[in-house]
Amino acid sequence: PNVIVIQEPVKEWLSITDENGRNFLEVFYEDKKRWSYTFQNLAYLTRMKLLFDALDNINTITFKNIWNRILGNKFIIISERSILTDKNTFAKMLKDSDDMNNMEYSLYNKCFPVLLNRVKMSNVIYLQTDPTKSFERLTFRNRNEEKKIPLGYIESVNEYHNKWLCNNDDIRVLILDGNNDFETDDIKNKLNLITMISKIKEF
């Protein structure tokens, strides 16, 4: 099959700034109660745009390439994070912490029928990672907007991901160990990567 990979639209989030030059990531982490609803909508819109662009690209390729049409070649879209992840983890977490009020949360959830009428998510690959490892990677990434994120926030994100994806009978979920460091030349990590790829192919 042909594979299209959709990356996190973080460049879009960083490109929109206020009069003081602060971008959306920065103001969100500084004041979640003020910016949670706005940022979650931005995340939804930018992810949806990338997904729809990918679908339009597939339709164009299929239309132009007669062999794709004759052979019925399949396309697989792999998104860095599902829009449903935003809905079931980040937005719900912000609602439960009172950073997003009831009216905002209700309005936010009204967006999703627009997406789900066009797109059906088939599978989820969950790279389950210890919060301390995620925090370590976030610190190493050294993104200026994320420097004040506490470990507690990462632990909450992990908790909500686990609640949604572990033992979820409504979605096909492949849970993989995300704690391995695949950027090193360690033979054990390379073998773990090979095993992980094999599981994904079987999935």
Located regions from the model:
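Conserved substrate/cofactor phosphate-moiety recognition/catalytic segment
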Residues: 2-40
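Hydrophobic/aromatic beta-strand patches that form the interior of the parallel beta-sheet core
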Residues: 6, 123-125, 172-176
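Conserved nucleotide-binding/hydrolysis micro-motifs of P-loop NTPases
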Residues: 10-13, 83-85, 129-134, 180-182
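Short aromatic-enriched loop/helix-cap "lid" or pocket-rim segments at secondary-structure transitions
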Residues: 16-21, 89-92, 136-139, 187-189
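Glycine-rich phosphate-binding loop used to anchor ATP phosphates in small-molecule kinases
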Residues: 34-119
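Short glycine-/polar-rich loops that comprise or flank the Walker A/P-loop
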Residues: 74, 118-123, 169-172
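A glycine- and Lys/Arg-enriched "phosphate-lid" helix/loop adjacent to the NTP-binding pocket
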Residues: 87-159
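NTP-dependent small-molecule kinase module
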Residues: 135-203
